Amino acid sequence: MRHPLVKNAEDRMNKAVEKISEELRKMRTGRPSPAILEEIKVDYYGAQTPISQLATVNITEDRALIIKPWDRSVLSSIEKAIFASDLGLTPQNDGNVIRLTFPTPTTEQRQKWAKKAKEIAEQGKIAIRNIRRDILKELKGDTKDGKISEDDEKRIEKEIQDLTDKKILEIDKLLEKKEKEIMEV
């Protein structure tokens, strides 16, 4: 049976990996993805509403996203929200839909995005190591208090280290996949 500290560490590490995965997924790459619009909120009748709740977002073959709101009165609000975001894209409003064209990124831009992806991954690794440190500190306290034998402490330490290594490897794989996606022309 797994020790509760190992279970706690695994739950916390899984959440950290999921958060990093989500951050990387939302990052802009050279190709259009509806995920980059998830953080943009539109003022809709006084409420900050995600674009995905106001419109359908489709990808076209020519490196563009088409945003088609269900209520055309919200077109200008969506356009303003995209302008105000830090995406660096210029929305084109034709009265029915908003078109976001993704220019082919320069090598310099791709390198900048890859660097940002590495920073995000490194934050995730630091979070994993901090979780390990906290759990091991708790484990040492339990051993000192006599709740856990020294043999069990060593076994649990090894389990936590193996778990840490596994989660850091997961983050490395997520980063590798994202870097490949970024550098693809």
UniProtKB/Swiss-Prot annotation:
It is found in: Cytoplasm. Keywords: Cytoplasm, Protein biosynthesis. It comes from the Bacteria. It holds the Pfam family RRF. Signal peptide: none annotated. Coiled coil: none annotated. One of its GO terms (cellular component) is cytoplasm. GO terms for biological process: translational termination. InterPro entries: Ribosome_recyc_fac, Ribosome_recyc_fac_dom, RRF_sf. GO terms for molecular function: ribosomal large subunit binding. Belongs to the RRF family. Responsible for the release of ribosomes from messenger RNA at the termination of protein biosynthesis. May increase the efficiency of translation by recycling ribosomes from one round of translation to another. HAMAP family: RRF. This is Ribosome-recycling factor. It comes from Pseudothermotoga lettingae (strain ATCC BAA-301 / DSM 14385 / NBRC 107922 / TMO). The lineage of its organism: Bacteria, Thermotogati, Thermotogota, Thermotogae, Thermotogales.
